[in-house]
């Protein structure tokens, strides 16, 4: 009965206060996504400050991502129980408090504890925005603008992360990587309390919650991320990695089989949402993969620091901001599938344009690929949001938003693991091939290394070969990174096949299965 009543409630008029409340939600999401990139650019600084071993330092990021990806699909359930207002207040309060805890951590374990809390709260803040678009705004221009703001900030945050992290690292102490969240956290918390709609909480739903299905999902997602973390180094079929993937499959299967699962997997019976999640997954691979791959090239090949890397990547962010107003207008009048096809095709081309780099590639050569990716990424996220979530009933929109955002984050995690596998397995192979070319085809080897034939050492001179090994390593990594760019482009281009298979957008919503949690 409560859900039927919820479905009849119309969004309140889009007042200034409502827009302020939605703005607070967007800032919270932006902080959560930005925090990932800000911290990852400065892990070495934190490692030195807290005397944490390099072998354990990666867990500072992994635990955040695990907690985040577990909480994302729970957001729909939590919105129904606590309402958007109180869930946001609780999440932003926890995120801000955990940020303070991270800043004042004194060892590895205290930092991990607060990163877990920070990640769980951050995971709630992300899908909360996309659910709010359809719960707070009626269909029309307001909903389109809200979608654009939320979608733009979601793709802008990873782009600005390296610049922000680099600036903080070079200007302040590592503590400010976390303390930067405090002021906006407090401001948005106050705005959320006073500006977001006041609805009744439904704490009684805790009594009927299927905790077993929650445990299955949590274990499955944690196992998947641990497996993805270890796969590039251990091998994708290594026993421990394969075991993690097996736990993931079994956990998801058991959760789906639960008659009243806490996660509404049955919503994927809606073709629009199912295909939208696939597109979101593909975008996650391309978007997070590109934001990871370009800094990798700049750091390993050009030896740039975080701030310089951030300044180079800023081109993408500027292109995103400049084209956003056009995306708002086009998204209102053009078929969502056609716009998505244009967006993914152009984004794939932008990825492919970066697949021909050399060790001499500089800012000018990296400019236009970034412009293309930045200009069209909005068309990869706004139209899919419109058809994936636009026809879901109000009582299920929050669950659908969780699944949609989970798909993008899973795509990002898998994409980064795939990149690491390509770069760090193919790099040594290319190095061996270049050394062989120095003996067999000096002219070709010199071209790859950016040298003249006269500058190449004699292939029988060990000391001479040692002198060019740094250049060989840079060239081999560049070739491996180029292959990763091509793989990202091919995967992104698969979205065109997905859109073709999808067919016309269908409006009927799936029926709630008998016994399922409404």
Model-derived regions: residue spans:
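Hydrophobic transmembrane architecture of multi-pass small-molecule transporters
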Residues: 7, 11, 56, 187, ...
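12-transmembrane solute porter fold
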Residues: 17-41, 50, 54-61, 76, ...
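Helix-loop-helix hairpins in multi-pass membrane proteins, especially solute transporters
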Residues: 41, 74-212, 239
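MFS transmembrane alpha-helix packing/gate-lining sites
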Residues: 64-71, 121, 153-157, 319-320, ...
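Small-residue-rich packing faces within the transmembrane alpha-helices of Major Facilitator Superfamily
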Residues: 69, 96-97, 182-189, 348-349, ...
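Short helix-capping/hinge motifs at transmembrane helix termini and TM-loop junctions
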Residues: 105-106, 138, 195-198, 232-233, ...
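Hydrophobic transmembrane-helix bundles of small-molecule transporters
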Residues: 148, 170-280, 286, 304-305, ...
């Amino acid at each position: 009965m409560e859900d039927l009543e919820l479905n009849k409630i119309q969004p309140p008029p889009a007042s200034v206060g409502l827009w302020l409340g939605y703005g607070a939600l967007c800032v919270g999401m932006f902080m959560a996504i930005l925090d990932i990139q800000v911290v990852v650019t400065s892990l070495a600084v934190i490692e030195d400050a807290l005397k944490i071993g390099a072998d354990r330092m990666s867990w500072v990021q992994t635990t955040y991502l695990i907690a985040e990806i577990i909480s994302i699909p729970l957001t729909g359930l939590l919105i129904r129980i606590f309402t958007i207002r109180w869930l946001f207040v609780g999440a932003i309060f926890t995120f801000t408090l955990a940020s303070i805890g991270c800043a004042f951590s004194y060892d590895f374990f205290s930092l991990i504890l607060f990163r877990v809390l920070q990640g769980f709260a951050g995971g709630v803040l992300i899908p909360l925005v996309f659910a709010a678009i359809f719960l707070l705004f009626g269909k029309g221009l307001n909903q389109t603008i809200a979608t654009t703001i939320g979608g733009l900030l979601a793709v802008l945050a990873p782009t600005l992360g390296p610049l922000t992290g680099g600036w903080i690292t070079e200007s302040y102490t590592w503590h400010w990587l976390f303390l930067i969240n405090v002021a906006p956290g407090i401001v948005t918390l106050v705005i959320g309390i006073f500006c977001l709609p006041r609805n009744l909480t439904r704490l009684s739903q805790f009594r009927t919650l299927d905790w077993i299905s929650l445990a299955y999902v949590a274990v499955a997602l944690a196992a998947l991320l641990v497996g993805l973390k270890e796969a590039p180094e251990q091998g994708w079929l290594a026993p421990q990695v394969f075991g993690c993937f097996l736990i993931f499959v079994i956990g998801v299967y058991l959760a789906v089989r639960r008659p009243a699962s806490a996660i509404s997997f049955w919503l994927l019976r809606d073709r629009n949402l199912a295909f939208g999640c696939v597109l979101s997954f593909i975008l996650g691979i391309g978007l997070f993969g590109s934001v990871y791959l370009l800094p990798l090239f700049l750091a390993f090949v050009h030896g740039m620091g975080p701030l310089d890397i951030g300044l180079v990547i800023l081109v993408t962010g500027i292109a995103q901001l400049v084209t956003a107003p056009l995306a708002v207008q086009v998204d209102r009048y053009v078929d969502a599938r056609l716009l998505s096809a244009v967006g993914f095709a152009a984004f794939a081309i932008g990825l492919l344009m970066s697949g021909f780099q050399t060790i001499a590639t500089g800012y000018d050569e990296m400019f236009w690929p970034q412009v293309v990716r930045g200009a069209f990424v909005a068309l990869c996220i706004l139209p899919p949001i419109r058809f994936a979530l636009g026809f879901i009933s109000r009582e299920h929109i929050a669950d659908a938003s969780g699944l949609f955002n989970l798909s993008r984050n899973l795509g990002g995690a898998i994409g980064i693991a795939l990149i690491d596998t390509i770069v760090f397995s193919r790099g040594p192979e290319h190095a061996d091939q270049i050394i062989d070319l120095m003996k067999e085809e000096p002219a070709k080897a010199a071209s790859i290394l950016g040298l003249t034939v006269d500058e190449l050492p004699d292939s029988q001179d060990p000391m001479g070969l040692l002198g060019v090994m740094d250049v060989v390593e840079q060239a081999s990594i560049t070739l491996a990174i180029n292959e990763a760019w091509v793989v990202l482009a091919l995967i992104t281009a698969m979205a065109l096949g997905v859109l073709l298979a999808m067919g016309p957008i269908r409006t009927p919503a799936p029926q709630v299965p008998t016994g399922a949690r409404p």
